[in-house]
Structure formats: structure tokens, C-alpha cells
């Protein structure tokens, strides 16, 4: 049995692409905008864990604003990613998650539970267990990071790589 996985490419349009931005503000005193990039009514996205994480951050002194995304066009999603201070992913299951890659492409750091393939490209400090305190710690670590070293997505998430792998697969099927 021959199985191959071709990851979805990150198709953020050029006008939305930005380098990862450092957070600028007063530690544990200023407002942070946390993006929960999904519809909170979807139980597999684990919105409750995101809210608990926000509550812990507020108990530490942060003023937390949590933005959620319901069914939105991609341009609105990318716009929300541009203005957020970080994206928080708490899903119970994901194949990607594509929103993590899109957020990074838009210049917004990601904090995530270890779901899908995030562990293959996110820094270890940005990944936490399914625990609100651990996620709050990861959020603070992410906010502290100056992102001086350029962080980019691996090449296998590019459109060119996707097309090359897809064409190779099609050629093998007809051969």
C-alpha cells in the first residue's frame, strides 16, 4: 500500500503577507487582541478552553479581547489576523490547521495545542497541552518573543510545492 500526504498550501494573497510582528505594549497592563479563528458554536474547536485561557491571562493583569470568526470570506479572516496580537488554536482535532499557517503568513504569531501538523513548524514555546494555564503561559511566551529571527513557513506549504507534488501524483496515476 502506497500512501502519500500532500499538505494544503497556504494561499494567502500577496497584499496580506507580513513578517511576524512583535507585540508592543506594557507587560500585563495593556490590551491584547486574541483571535479564536473559528465559530465558537463548533464543539470540536474547543472555544471553552480558549475562554478559560483568556480568563487566566486576565487574572494575570492582561486586558483580553477575544475575536471569533464565524463564516467569513478569506479576506475578512486575513484582515482579522493582521490586527490580532496572536491567534489561539484549541481544537480537539484538525488536519492542518490551515488557519495557523494563514495567521503566520499574515504576520500574527500562533499559540496552539498540539493538533494536526503544528508541531512540525511552530516553535516549541508556542505549543501547549490542552490546559488553560499552559496555554496562557505559551501566550505570554509568544508575546515576549521579539521575532527578530525571520520565521517563515516550511517550503512544503507553498503553492509551488503543492502544485509540484500534485502534478507528480497525477503523473504516477496515469503511468
Map each language-model feature to its residues.
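Donor nucleotide-sugar binding/catalytic pocket of nucleotide-sugar-dependent glycosyltransferases
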Residues: 1-19
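Short alpha-helical donor nucleotide-sugar binding micro-motif in glycosyltransferases
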Residues: 79-84
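Aromatic "clamp/platform" in nucleotide-sugar-dependent glycosyltransferases that forms part
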Residues: 92
Amino acid at each position: 500500500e502506497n500512501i502519500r500526504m500532500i499538505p494544503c498550501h497556504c494561499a494567502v494573497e500577496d497584499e496580506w503577507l507580513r513578517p511576524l510582528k512583535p507585540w508592543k505594549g506594557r507587560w500585563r497592563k495593556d490590551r491584547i487582541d486574541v483571535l479564536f479563528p473559528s465559530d465558537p458554536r463548533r464543539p470540536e474547536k474547543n472555544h471553552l478552553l480558549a475562554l478559560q485561557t483568556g480568563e487566566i491571562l486576565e487574572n494575570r493583569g492582561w486586558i483580553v479581547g477575544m475575536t471569533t470568526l464565524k463564516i467569513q470570506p478569506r479576506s475578512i479572516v486575513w484582515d482579522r489576523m493582521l490586527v490580532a496580537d496572536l491567534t489561539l488554536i484549541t481544537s480537539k482535532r484538525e488536519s492542518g490547521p490551515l488557519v495557523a499557517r494563514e495567521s503566520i503568513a499574515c504576520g500574527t504569531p500562533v499559540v496552539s495545542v498540539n493538533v494536526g501538523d503544528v508541531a512540525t513548524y511552530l516553535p516549541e514555546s508556542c505549543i501547549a497541552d490542552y490546559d488553560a494555564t499552559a496555554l496562557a503561559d505559551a501566550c505570554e511566551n509568544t508575546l515576549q518573543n521579539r521575532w527578530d529571527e525571520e520565521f517563515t513557513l516550511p517550503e512544503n506549504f507553498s503553492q509551488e510545492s503543492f502544485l509540484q507534488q500534485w502534478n507528480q501524483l497525477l503523473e504516477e496515476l496515469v503511468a
